[in-house]
């Protein structure tokens, strides 16, 4: 079943700081995209008003069900704006995460990245996600009481790889996300 998630919280270090309106989409077959646009971009952010955008195919993520509502997911992004823009001090390579379902229906994601290199100290992060109903036009919360959710929403994936561009577009129910990057 496809999924649409709204990020509620982003935390690195002791203080949460959510400056984006982030939605992540997952297709029925496991393709994923996450667009993290700044709510109030300023300064240099105005030229590219995204904290980050990344996407991948079901071949670039390893998922393992640990039981009791816990899943590990190891991502190796196929498309990554930090790589494309050559942003300094950003993680490269696989990101290992743990996802835990809360009784409220929210999903906590934790992990660590290595922005200064794999041989340097890691930086832990925490994100809190709220599943939303992809068949609705508004952001309608799914499973507020941890009830089983089913939807007739379908997913469509368009992957572009040609001599000029790489890109991924995912349609989940009534929602669409995508981005393309020119090849150098």
Curated annotation (Swiss-Prot):
Gene3D superfamilies assigned to the protein according to its UniProt record, in alphabetical order: Protein HRI1, C-terminal domain, Protein HRI1, N-terminal domain
Subcellular location as annotated: Cytoplasm; Nucleus
InterPro entries according to UniProt: Hri1 (IPR031818), Hri1_N (IPR038744), Hri1_N_sf (IPR043047)
UniProtKB keywords: Cytoplasm, Nucleus, Phosphoprotein
Pfam families: HRI1
Tagged with keyword Phosphoprotein: yes
Main location: cytoplasm
Modified residues (Phosphoserine): 143
Keyword Glycosyltransferase: no
One cellular component (GO) term of this entry: nucleus
Family note: Belongs to the HRI1 family.
Subunit structure: Interacts with HRR25. May interact with SEC72.
Protein name: Protein HRI1
Biological source species: Saccharomyces cerevisiae (strain VIN 13)
Classification of source organism: Eukaryota, Fungi, Dikarya, Ascomycota, Saccharomycotina
């Amino acid at each position: 079943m496809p999924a649409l998630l709204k990020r509620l919280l982003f935390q690195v270090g002791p203080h949460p700081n959510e400056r984006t309106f982030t939605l992540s989409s997952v297709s029925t077959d496991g393709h994923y995209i996450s667009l993290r646009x700044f709510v109030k971009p300023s300064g240099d952010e105005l030229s590219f008003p995204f904290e980050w955008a990344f996407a991948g195919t079901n071949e670039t993520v390893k998922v393992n069900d640990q039981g009791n509502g816990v899943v590990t997911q190891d991502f190796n992004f196929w498309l990554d704006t930090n790589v494309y823009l050559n942003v300094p001090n950003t993680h490269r390579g696989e990101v290992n995460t743990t996802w835990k379902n809360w009784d409220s229906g929210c999903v906590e994601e934790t992990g660590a990245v290595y922005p200064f290199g794999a041989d340097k100290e890691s930086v832990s992060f925490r994100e809190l996600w709220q599943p939303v109903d992809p068949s609705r036009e508004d952001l309608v919360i799914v499973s507020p009481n941890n009830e089983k959710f089913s939807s007739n929403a379908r997913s469509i994936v368009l992957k572009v790889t040609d001599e000029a561009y790489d890109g991924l577009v995912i349609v989940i129910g009534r929602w669409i996300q995508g981005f393309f990057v020119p090849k150098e």
